[in-house]
């Protein structure tokens, strides 16, 4: 029988704090990056992921690309997402630092776990 996974949420933010009890504090969720010029360097971007499903450990990949173009980065995470017994939720975050954005436009972040995907979006705009 194949394991079943549901990606419950994904957020793009500037920082994540993990409390001693494992709770996450997600700081400054955003969907737009502004820059004076391109290419631009965004100092830090976190992708926070929450998933539920069958208990186990799962490989996670995160890809960032400008819509309609090749990926600017893809990470297969060295640490697997651990999903504990129901009703607990697996949580994981990925840090991209620095993130080079070559041009203004619409970008998508694709999160993949066991064939399940979730897309997040952000705009890069010139100010």
Region roles according to the model:
Residues 3-104, 108-127:
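Contiguous segments within soluble domain cores/interaction surfaces
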